[in-house]
Structures are given as structure tokens and as C-alpha cells.
Regions:
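Catalytic cores of the polymerase beta-like nucleotidyltransferase superfamily
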Residues: 1-442
């Protein structure tokens, strides 16, 4: 049980049947979606189905269980009240809202009024039907006010519960979330939603930079984030997420050293594809370094630093990304084509300087080789330690099994004896290894 599940169990246990909150607390949004997908919670969003219920509930919890619940914290802009719950020395943020509907001016941007509403009205204003699901904390019953949230979730379809243009204009970050869900969860985006995103990308100028940065970081953790970046380019969203980078990615000039006359973006896309497919857990710093590597090589690190800072990425993180691009450029300068031209000690000192980052740097070099001509590819295998290296996969198809049936014991008793003998030998080898380790440690 992770910290989110423990927190929900705690809240469920302390709200008894005689409490006014009993039966009125719902898990909502991503919590319910992820649970139905068989995934673990990544955050906790609660809804209290009563007027001003979110404030009353959080204030009650912080007063009655002050040893566990710290707060309350009020976020007037989003109509949210939150608290920190401490269980087993782990801190979990719990955000709470009431069902509400927002009244906007004719521009669909200016918020005029927020009022309490029914669950059906609350569901109609959410971003996608698969996120408009409500699970009662005490009964466990899942409500689907739109009537299609569960079926859309099963079919992997992203569609807004009402007019997508209105939904996106009221909160432009929902467009970016749609792209992220498409690649993070493997969903399909409804054609009407895709068209609405393309037609209303300019509204992203009204979004808070921090929210855009958070969505970008989440997108980078998906296996197909390279295609996600391509979608951001196609829809016009990338110019708001990372201002200044689009002009480099849309440059039609062939990339120097690229295979078959590919452009800068085509090479970057191939490199990102390798990182996402083969090394999805690579630190996002290395993924961002891969994203801007070609720009740094052609236009310098100063321009890349400005692009990253304009995207709201912190200075410390930007410094780490630029350091990685500098390391890659230094490594590339050690070679003239396939020939190593630097003094021998330079490579040794360079490898030692990488320390714990050696694996990540090796993966980066390997990814950057993708789409380059063979004569300009860099030897990424140099970063394996002695005795290490990629092991060939053991093929187990029928073509590599003994062709003769005589090689298999036909006698069941003989087969059983062979099995017991092999088990005994494995145990003997295991005990021998254990004795060697004990001897070395003593």
C-alpha cells in the first residue's frame, strides 16, 4: 500500500456514519481513472458534495486530527482547499473542491462567477469524459454523470464532455493535457478535439508558465514523448511551451552529418525515439539535453540556455542540461570521423569525470548516433566498464533447439532424475558462492 492509499484509508476511517461528510466525499478525476486502468494513484483529488464542503471538510480534519493533518491551505484562484497528511513519516497533499460551475464572459476567458452545482453540471465542465468520474469514498460506487466516461476509458478515447472549443478556451492547459494523455496513456484524441486544439492554440498565451512546465515534464516521462513533441509542433502549442525552439525544428535545411538528407528535427526525433523506447526511465534532464543537443551544436549553448529559461525551466536545471551538451561536444571533438585524434589520457580523464552519469551519457551518445552517417557516429560502447557490455539475447525459438528427438529423455523417470540432479547442482553452486562471499568479507 503506497502513501496515497494509506491516506485514503485514514480519511475513510476517521469519517464515521454520524458525520455530515459521510457519503459526501468522492474521489474525482485522475484518481478514479488510474484506478480503473489498474494503475496506482499519483495524487489525491477529493470532492465534497455540499456547499462550501471543501473548506468545512479540510478545516474539520486539520482541527480534529492536527497531529496528522496540516493546513488548511486556500487556493482562491482555483477554488481549492488543501491539507498535508502525514502517515508513517510520509507527507501527502490532499486537494479538495466542491462541485461547481463557472460562468464566463463572452470571450470564454474572463471568469465572472463560480457557484455550487450538481455532479452532472460539474462533470460537464471537466476536460475529458474519462476524467469526469466520481467514486464515493465510503461506498466505493463509481458515478459516471456524462454516461460515457467509463466506455470512453475502456476504448481509450479522449473526448470533451461538452463543446471542445469552450472547454479549451476556459482552460487552455487542457489542450496540452490532451496531447500528454494521448502519449502517456496510449489514448486516441477525438478528431473534433484535435481540430479545436489546432484552431485555438493561441489561447495558450493565457496559461500559467508553471502549469505548462509541469505538463512538459510529465510528457517527457512517456515512451512516445518524441511523437508528443511532434504533435505540439503540428498543433502550434510548442511555441508557447518552449518559445524560440520551433524555428529550429521547422528549418527545412538538411542536418549536417544526417543520413539521407534528414533535417535537424528529423534527427532529433529519431534520437528522442530511441531514448523513449529503450530507456524510458532516463532522467528528464538527459531527455531535455537530447531535445536541444543539435541546436546547441549548431547555434551555441547560449541560445539553448535562453530557450530553456524562456520555457520556465529553473536555472540550476538549465545549467545541468548545458553541462551535458558541453560534455557531448567535448567527446565529439575527440574524433575526426571514426579516428580518435585527442591524446590518450584525455579520454581516460573524460570517462572518469562522468562518474555515476556514465550510463546516462552512454545512452545519450547512442541515441544521438541514430540517423547519423556511419562515419560520424561516436563509439558509445567505450562507456561500458571492463567486462561489461550489451549481452546478446538468447534466442529460444524452435530453430535453435536440438533437431533430434533422441536428445530428449523419453523415459519420464529419467526426466525426473535429470531435473532433481540439476536442482541439486544449482544448490551446490549457490552454497559455494555464498561461502566465497563470506570468506572475502571476513
Amino acid at each position: 500500500m503506497n502513501k496515497f492509499e494509506k491516506t485514503l484509508h485514514f480519511i475513510k476511517d476517521v469519517i464515521h456514519e454520524d458525520s455530515p461528510f459521510y457519503g459526501q466525499i468522492y474521489l474525482v478525476g485522475g484518481c478514479v481513472r488510474d484506478e480503473l486502468l489498474g494503475e496506482r494513484y499519483s495524487d489525491i483529488d477529493l470532492l465534497v458534495n455540499m456547499p462550501n464542503g471543501q473548506k468545512a471538510f479540510i478545516e474539520y480534519m486539520c482541527a480534529e486530527h492536527a497531529d496528522r493533518c496540516k493546513g488548511p491551505f486556500y487556493y482562491q484562484r482555483y477554488g481549492t482547499t488543501a491539507m498535508d497528511v502525514i502517515i508513517d513519516d510520509s507527507l501527502t497533499l490532499v486537494e479538495c473542491v466542491e462541485p461547481h460551475i463557472e460562468e464566463y464572459a463572452d470571450d470564454d476567458i474572463t471568469l465572472l462567477e463560480t457557484r455550487f452545482c450538481s455532479l452532472e453540471e460539474d462533470a460537464s465542465r471537466r476536460d475529458y469524459t474519462c476524467n469526469a468520474l466520481y467514486k464515493n469514498l465510503h461506498t466505493g460506487k463509481v458515478l459516471d454523470p456524462t454516461g460515457r466516461g467509463i466506455s470512453d476509458l475502456k476504448n481509450g478515447l479522449l473526448i470533451t464532455p461538452s463543446d471542445p472549443v469552450t472547454i479549451y478556451r476556459q482552460d487552455p492547459v487542457r489542450m496540452l493535457r490532451g496531447i500528454r494523455f494521448k502519449h502517456q496513456k496510449g489514448f486516441r484524441l477525438d478528431p473534433a478535439c484535435w481540430k479545436a486544439i489546432c484552431d485555438n492554440a493561441d489561447y495558450m498565451a493565457n496559461a500559467a508558465p508553471k502549469r505548462l512546465r509541469d505538463e512538459l515534464n510529465k510528457l517527457l516521462k512517456s515512451r512516445t514523448f518524441c511523437d508528443g513533441i511532434q504533435d505540439l509542433i503540428t498543433t502550434g502549442l510548442l511555441q508557447y511551451v518552449m518559445p524560440g525552439i520551433v524555428e529550429h525544428f521547422t528549418n527545412p535545411m538538411p542536418f549536417e552529418g544526417g543520413e539521407g538528407g534528414i533535417t535537424l528535427w528529423e534527427h532529433t526525433h529519431r534520437a528522442l525515439s530511441v531514448q523513449g523506447r529503450e530507456h524510458p526511465r532516463t532522467d528528464t534532464i538527459y531527455k531535455l539535453a537530447c531535445l536541444v543537443m543539435d541546436i546547441a551544436l549548431l547555434n551555441g549553448r547560449d541560445e539553448v540556455g535562453q530557450i530553456l529559461l524562456n520555457a520556465g525551466i529553473g536555472r540550476e536545471k538549465v545549467g545541468s542540461i548545458l553541462h551535458i551538451t558541453e560534455l557531448y561536444e567535448r567527446f565529439r571533438n575527440m574524433f575526426d570521423g571514426e579516428e580518435y585524434v585527442a591524446p590518450p589520457r584525455v579520454l581516460v580523464r573524460f570517462q572518469n569525470s562522468l562518474s555515476k552519469s556514465r550510463d546516462n551519457f552512454r545512452r545519450l551518445v547512442r541515441a544521438e548516433n541514430t540517423g547519423l552517417l556511419p562515419e560520424v557516429q561516436l563509439p558509445w560502447r567505450l562507456f561500458y566498464d571492463d567486462g561489461e557490455g550489451p549481452q546478446p539475447r538468447q534466442r529460444r525459438d524452435h530453430d535453435h533447439r536440438p533437431a533430434s528427438p533422441a536428445s530428449f529423455p523419453s523415459d519420464p523417470e529419467a526426466s525426473s532424475r535429470n531435473h532433481k540432479r540439476n536442482v541439486k547442482r544449482r544448490e551446490q553452486r549457490k552454497r559455494a558462492r555464498s561461502r566465497r562471499r563470506n570468506t572475502e568479507s571476513s
